[in-house]
From Swiss-Prot:
InterPro entries: PIH1/Kintoun_subfamily (IPR050734), PIH1_N (IPR012981), PIH1D1/2/3_CS-like (IPR041442). Transmembrane segments: none annotated. It holds the Pfam family PIH1. This is PIH1 domain-containing protein 2. Disulfide bonds: none annotated. It comes from the Eukaryota. It comes from Xenopus tropicalis (Western clawed frog). Belongs to the PIH1 family.
Length: 321
């Protein structure tokens, strides 16, 4: 299906982008410099190709027994975990058949591998995480024993890079829509900066609504998704957050207060928040996913949330039952 994003639309977006950049350069030179420098740095890091780190030698047991080489590499496109308590993001390439076995590329953030090489236990955990991910991704069974190959890379760097990038491009909608989304993202960021410059104030409350359903039914917490969507959601990092309990004079829980730092988010429209009596789910598509079991039952009908664009803080207030 061809994209409806035409050349005329793209030209209009570009003109709007330049207009807003000119306005920022004139009215807020410091913000303009920071904006340009950050995007140049991010662009440079994003374009850095994956670098081989070590190669693991093991075996595929099922469906067919064969040698497997796992090229573990470092790549800036893979984010670092938000904290030590958060899951480690991972990216995998495609299984490629060679004359003497099969090879697959696994990418971690450079800082993750740097720390792992200082601790043999942590490095072993990363290797086993990679093996488990490969088993689940490709529905195969691996031998749980392995050894580190005497070389860093099986195959060549070009094949490894292409394999990882093919996976990153899936699931693709179409190039036109992707370009449109990128342009809109930049425009939204510029609009947000301009808005913050004009007024440092909190945005209106997020409206949390529920469809007519029995009260025991959780809203939006169960959703049928494809296997690809499931993989993508599991890989999304959890944002920094802080959950506190306010109590009345008698010491009884009165409400739960959740603070969430959503860097890179500029509008409440990007957030999908669902709260039930005993848990909370926050999703920012393509950026963050946070699922919390609440320590106290809350009144889901009176939950309120506000997003402060100036500091990227989402504040959720949940009165207890």
């Amino acid at each position: 299906m061809e994209s409806s994003f035409t050349q005329k639309d793209m030209l209009a977006q570009v003109n709007q982008l330049w207009s807003m950049l000119d306005d920022m350069a004139e009215n807020s030179p410091e913000s303009y410099q920071k904006f340009i420098q950050r995007h140049m740095k991010e662009g440079k890091e994003f374009m850095t190709p994956p670098e081989p780190n070590l190669c693991i030698h093991t075996k595929i047991l099922e469906p067919d027994e064969k040698i497997l080489f796992i090229n573990i590499c470092q790549w800036n496109r893979v984010p670092a975990p938000m904290s030590e308590a958060h899951p480690v993001p991972i990216s995998a390439g495609q299984l490629e058949n060679l004359s003497d076995g099969t090879v697959v590329a696994i990418a971690y953030n450079p800082e993750v591998l740097k720390r792992a090489h200082q601790d043999h236990v942590e490095l072993d955990q990363l290797i086993r995480l990679a093996m488990k991910y490969i088993e689940e991704q490709y529905q195969i069974t691996l031998c749980h024993s392995y050894h580190v190959a005497p070389f860093q890379l099986k195959g060549n760097a070009k094949m490894m890079k292409e394999s990882l990038e093919r996976i990153q491009k899936q699931p693709a909608t179409n190039k036109g829509n992707s370009s449109c989304a990128t342009d809109n993202s930049l425009l939204e960021e510029l609009k947000s900066i301009a808005l913050i410059r004009e007024k440092q104030e909190t945005s209106p409350s997020i409206c949390i609504t529920r469809e007519d359903a029995p009260k025991s039914t959780k809203t939006k917490l169960i959703e049928e998704i494809s296997s690809t969507d499931l993989q993508n959601r599991d890989l999304l990092p959890s944002p920094w957050h802080e959950l506190s309990v306010t109590k009345d004079n008698a010491g009884h829980p009165q409400s739960l207060i959740l603070k969430v730092k959503l860097r890179g988010v500029h509008s409440v429209a990007e957030c999908d928040l669902s709260v039930s009596k005993d848990d909370l789910l926050l999703v920012v598509p393509g950026r963050y996913r946070l699922l919390l079991n609440l320590p106290q039952a809350v009144n889901e009908e009176t939950v309120a949330a506000k997003f402060n664009k100036a500091n990227y803080i989402l504040l959720v207030t949940m009165p207890t039952l």
